[in-house]
From Swiss-Prot:
It comes from Thermus thermophilus (strain ATCC 27634 / DSM 579 / HB8). Coiled coil: none annotated. The lineage of its organism: Bacteria, Thermotogati, Deinococcota, Deinococci, Thermales. The gene is rlmH. Belongs to the RNA methyltransferase RlmH family. This is Ribosomal RNA large subunit methyltransferase H. Homodimer.
Amino acid sequence: MRLRVVAVGRPRLAYARLGVEEYARRMRRYAPLDLVFVRKGEELLPKAEGHRKVVLDERGRLLTTEELYRRLLAWEGERVAFLVGGAEGHPEAVREEADLLLSLSPLTLQHELALLVLMEQLYRVLTLRAGHPYHRP
């Protein structure tokens, strides 16, 4: 599985930037990862061309870690892009192209925090896939 995370704007908050960098470093031990930052939401889709598209959206489906793991296993061998919008959310065109609209929480999350939570969950899923004991249900 090849993962790409495309986010609007680089994290400016120190905790988010450091956390995203740390989880990206950890994830690359388990799967190829591209971490791409764009300036505007309209730039997300071109960066996800040829990938399954998982769009983070507060109106999306809430999945457990295990459900996300199973979904990604079903896409094994494919390229999967996770699209994280900026403060304004996603343009409608991005939501319409989604293979999966995913909500990380019923709460509204600041976009840098949402990116960090996504990175931790992707790391968790990759360790599950590898049989690593990081995830303890």
